[in-house]
Amino acid sequence: MSSLDPSLSTTPSTNRRGTFSKAKSFRRAALNLEPQGTPGQPHAFRFLSGEEYSGPDIIENIKKPININIESEEYKTPLFLGANGTLYNKYYIPIKIIGIDEPLPQTGLSPSLSSSSSSSSSPSPPTTTSTTPPPPNNNNNSKQIKKNNSISDLTPYLNFNSTDQIYTSFPESMAFDDYMDYEESLVEWKRQVEQNLGIIQLPHSIGRTYPRPKVIHEQLFRKNSEASNDDSISYDIERKLTDSDIKETNSSVNDDGESFSHSPTLRGNNGSSLSVGGGGDNHDNTSNKDNASSQGTNHGVTLNHPNSGINLRERSNSDTSTGSFEGTQLDGSSPMDGSPSTGSLAGFVANGTRSRTNSITYFDQRNQRSNSLSPKHSMLQSRLADSQSLDSSMYGKMGRSGSGFGMDHESWFLQKDPWDSQLILTEPHPDLFSTYEEYEYAMKNWAHEVITKTSILPPHPGQFIQLPKNSELSTDDGSGGGSGGSGVDGVGGNHQLGGSARHMLEMDFEMAKNQSNWTLRPIIRPIITEETMIFNRILSQSNLKHTEYDHLFSIDQELPPSQVWKTLDSDEKLKITETIDRWYRKKLTIQRQTSTWFRGGLWANHFLMPNIQSGWRESVSKKSSILPPLSLKALRRLDINSEADGKRVEHSFPIPELPINFNKLLAPDMNLQYFLGMLEMPTAHSLSSATGGQQQGGSGGGSGGSGSGSGSGSGLNMSGTSGSSGKSEKDKDKETANYIAMHSINNTTNVGTKEDRRQYTKILQTYEQRLQFSFRLDALNSWSEGGYTPMELQEKKLDIEQLVAAPGFDLQNGVWSLVNNSAHFLDKFQETFDQVDLRLYAPAIPMLPAIVPSVFINAGGGSGGGSGGASGGGISTSSGTSPNIVRPGSSSIGGGQPPSSPHIPSGSSLLSSPPNRQGSTGSFSFIGSPGGGGKISPTNSSSLESPRTQSQLAAVVERGSSPRSHSGGSISTHPNTPSVSSNTFLSLINTDSFPELLKFLDLTNEKLALGKISSLVLLVLTSELKGTMVIENILFSKDLQSLYRLARAISFFDAVPLDLFTYPTHLNEMLTPSIFKGSTQEVVRLVFVYYYLGIIQERLNFFSNNVGILGFVNSSRKDAAERIGIQFQNDREFLYKIFKALGRKSILVSNCFLFVLIQLIKMSESPTVQSLLKGELLTHIRDLSASKFSHSRFAAKRLYQILQEDPWKEFLMASYAESIKKNESQHLTDLTTMKEGPKLAIPSISLISELTFNFCVGVLENINSTPIPKPIYKFILNDSIFFQLCNAIVKCKNFTQSTQIVSKVFASLCKVLAKFNLFKNSDSIKSGGKVDPKKQNDVETGVAISPTLLFEIIGFLQNSSLDNNRYCSIIKTNMLIALRQLLKQSEIFDSIKKEGNLYNKFLIPACRDGKNVEFNRNVWRLFFQMIRFHHGHIEYLEKSKYLNALMDIISLNAGNVVLTNALHYLSKLFSLVSYETRKNALRAPGTLSIDTKYSEKDVKSLLNFFVERSCFIKFHMIYKKLTENTEGIQIDQRLLINITTFYRIISFLPSCQKLLKDTLKNPEYKTGIIQVSKMYKPSETF
């Protein structure tokens, strides 16, 4: 074997995943899979021929030295053991082949190369043979080998002996009574093997085999996926076979009359030559009728000469790489009878190569599969076609016959499968899960198992194909491969035996099929609710028969679980809104926790995009219709991808890039899809040229810049783009960054609040949800099934048309049978009924207000127009239909006309709200949704009337014709003549039959059938003749069930599934007359009509441009809202009855009326309803929150949360502000409300108190930074509220949970008041609390703070009588925070700064007390802000000896809490000058700079104090104790970090040079500073 090229990269692949078999996974017990060797030594694994695979522990490329001394000991010493017995030295160069070039095996190093099962202690007869070559032997006389003697005549050292030093007999599962004993023997066998191996490394982890359960019929077997790898080459090319392996014969006949071909053969254990070629001369052999290879116990590999027939290789029915199986034989080695597969590690370790039974020729799937991801597919296919020597074989016709490659051929290694020896868990299949959360949870578990228990990650599942059944491969004329089991008398008799056995099993299966239900269940057991269990129990005890309603109890399709799976809290989930560094740290932490030695690439790339089994290119293209382009990049795999001639192969895989930091990159009120479009902007020049075609584009703009998505996601392809193809990628990236920078936050007049950012993050999370659910309908379409040609798909469409055109086609028989036929794909079904562009709908998400900068860049004269054929750089002035487009009155762009589109070319900063249809403020679709022609970008027009019209216009423009026809100015589109199938179906629809069509939705739960029914419903609604008629009839007949089904059908194609609320038909039976009397029943019915019509209106506007039905639905919805307002106004007790129903014991009734009330609150079309609700809504919520039922309290909480949102937020604030005018302070009453009841041992706050607390704190944290707060916030920014809160805490005699939340509100209120400088000093000696009623609401003048109030708060903090109370520490900490905010004002601080009690009785004792961590931290922070905000006060502290007392606290006797906080704030004091200097450099333009001369003076005084008093010795003793810990005491890491930071500041900052010079005079101090300095980089800035 040639040596390796040192220039080749050894970076391991990061895209390998498990097999995609649907077979059942078996639990894999944990084994010690750590590689053997010295700790810290790189563990390399010899992987495949011609390349080198670095194991999981190697993160750098391994390069061999240029000059290697082959006579050195390092070269001759074996260190690694290859798969076939090849030994490698430390340079990974093969130096010896065990059993080939040595007359005898070396002691301690020669593994036995015979089959493990040949000498097994199993009572079952041996059924496997070794494929290992025999020893060197110059005598080629095959007569020496006896046919029925498997081991006796072989060279002794090649026999498998249990006494061998390295390997012992592999356990047989049939030799044990139970599985646990078998597991124990496997573990013991592995331990002995690893102990005997010593320093020699195995290339794989020691795998295992599993006994399979018995099955009774072939129909239950699932096809297993061969774990082929595009990146793999073979183990067996690691060495060349010697002459002893290949036996050349001259068609001589042995003693038994066997004939041999001229092809090279390998010897089997029974002495027979393993010639399996179809081109051999063995047709005279009567005992080998079907030309199978060595039936019975003879299994091996034939390596044919290039001119001598097929290259066949034995392959087991059991796929050991997946734990799945497919077999039909009943021989002793078949996995059906419970024995493990012989293709397991037993054959791998003992033989050095694979040994598979009951199989036929295996060939590399990469050469034949139709959906190959490999670009070398066509080249290999042509090679194989040239070298194909046998086409008569059925297996060859299927594309699996072996080529004529010899072992020396350049592509011979492609026939090997390196993954056969490793058991790999089955990957979860997406179709088996009802929700994405279930699938994600299963994928995480699977990935954890594979990573932690597999040394070399398995290949990508997209590279696998399904194997044909064995019954299809076996033939009677001898042309096929050997697929039979172990034969009778070594001949092909087992084929007949297997056939009769299968016939008996088929009869048994038919009898058992009616006795048991065969159900396909997910891998993870779904959640079963209590109602489902009760229903199943009733069903099992009933006498229900399978009649015409048997679809209700389908045994093939299970109902989805009623509860959605949720990931555990401990599982980290990838969020699109996370920053890159934070996301990377989380993934890195997960990898370290799962496997300490795994350092490969990211393995969870598929979490954002579930794998598609086949046809992924078409699926990604379909996704471009609803989603922004998911960042895809073509990965160039240079580590182990190479052809035999040395050429590189480039693969393209869809890999999601790391998520974008939207929070830092975007303004909170910037529109999401505009930004996503901007990311795809190539250059500014291409923008101007692309938008040139927008002058004449329809009503409001053209489509010259519409993009088209590609399957690989390489970028946005602008039509009309010119002049950008010659630029490099770096130039494009730079210009794109410049374009984004022009639209950055700095160019916008934006002051975002926390609430706005929170709302914007919610929008991004909603967008992420679209990514997760957008793949859920892929399996219904034709591109999900590989192997269909366009002609075959066209024939399927013609079949549907023939069924529709057949006589007697009606609704009950024809339509129902058509939608239930699973052979018809959904997309072909829709094409038959003229629904070519019917795709997923992206539901509306809340929009943020548009931001319009006042800067407009003159575009000047533009270049020639784009696709629209117009010229000029400006935008046309056609009348737009979207009211959200901002049109400045006097601004002009280009030709001086106001813009009609928010997308301004050539770097303008104008942004506005998203494109809309007919003024809907809450409805827009993502890029190129079913109506659009491509992705949304800044060059797309947004003012067309409907997406359907935009799609037609874009198609016309792309064809190069005019967007306007020559007659009447109407849009020129494709002919809209309905097809014959559409006319036939619409002829069946009338006012009576349409509700029957809707009932089909209740008769099936199959996703494909529901999709077809929904498509037909949409076809009816988009019809100009039928649409309005059917909806009008439903509303006239008050058929709410049909209206519900109609909303369900039209929302079926949502990108995110919609959970519709069902109208409770049995509500009359559940409610008492006191609730359901009067107008309640009619209002509830109208609310559901309003709700369903809203869903229909939003989606119908997307799928249809029929003005008649759109106008009717809109008017009907408004009419329902007006009638609700009239009923509400006439019945004054209606709101009382709704809340009475909310408090009922029944959860169903409470949830139903909660839904009704929420719809009424959000009903903006009826001002009457809004005004009536505002009267008593808050009072009823307050009463409902005291209910004893949890569902009623949930209703109160949900309603209160809605009141905190727009537009009800102002109403809630105004209600509390009104109570202040009445001197009631209702929100304070709500804050202090406690739970009632004698059973409560410890009083706790009520629900209304918790809700009010969250509301008040949220308002205080999100108040805009305006100079003067808005009047609406006066309900909380009020001096009366301030003193009431303060007195409620200071004068409290017993702390409760209510006091705790009041203290939190008080601390937040003080922060806001201090931020706006609303505190003022008062010389009054009276305590605050009594406020002039005439001025109590005038907060603009400030809240008067007297010294008496300050001393009351300080006295409260000094009081220790309530320290044992559980709430005391938190309450005191909040009050200390409030005191810090009060003392920030210089006037207020000057009134008490010279009071001795402030320091002697409060500050110094509190700094010394470390019992309460947060309290102590805030006390030291108070000391820090005294110096920072009040210049010159440090001199007073020094003169008054208070500073010396504070420094005395820092000693070895102080606790870690005190020392940590003291060091932290002292470090901040020393670095105060540098901090303020850096802050001045980064300040925003127009803001005042900080005068640093006062800080420099204070820091200088502090440094002089340290030098004069020799204070550094205190810190040196602490440092010495931490660094010279000889007592074994655990070191506080936070304290260690703070002391090193303190040292670093002294040695680094220029302001501390005086202290540094004084410190360096002491050798011990100098040593400590030098040691700390070595911890940091010299160039690192502080």
Curated annotation (Swiss-Prot):
Composition skew (Low complexity), residue ranges: 1-14, 109-131, 715-726, 903-928, 960-972
Listed Polar residues bias regions: 249-267, 288-310, 318-332, 940-953
Example GO BP: positive regulation of Ras protein signal transduction
GO cellular component: cell leading edge; cytosol; plasma membrane; Ras guanyl-nucleotide exchange factor complex
Modified residues (Phosphoserine): S359
Knocked-out gene: effects: Display directionality defects during chemotaxis as well as defects in random motility.
GefA and gefH binding, as annotated region: 400-600
Transmembrane segments: none
Coiled-coil region(s): none
Record keywords, A-Z: Cell membrane, Membrane, Phosphoprotein, Repeat, TPR repeat
Residue spans of biased composition, Gly residues class: 478-493, 694-714, 864-875
Function as written in the Swiss-Prot or TrEMBL entry: Component of the Sca1 complex, a regulator of cell motility, chemotaxis and signal relay. The Sca1 complex is recruited to the plasma membrane in a chemoattractant- and F-actin-dependent manner and is enriched at the leading edge of chemotaxing cells where it regulates F-actin dynamics and signal relay by controlling the activation of rasC and the downstream target of rapamycin complex 2 (TORC2)-Akt/protein kinase B (PKB) pathway. ScaA acts as a molecular scaffold, bringing together gefA, gefH and phr with PP2A.
Description of how the protein assembles with itself and partners: Component of the Sca1 complex composed of at least gefA, gefH, scaA, phr, and the protein phosphatase 2A subunits pppA and pho2B.
Name of protein: Sca1 complex scaffold protein scaA
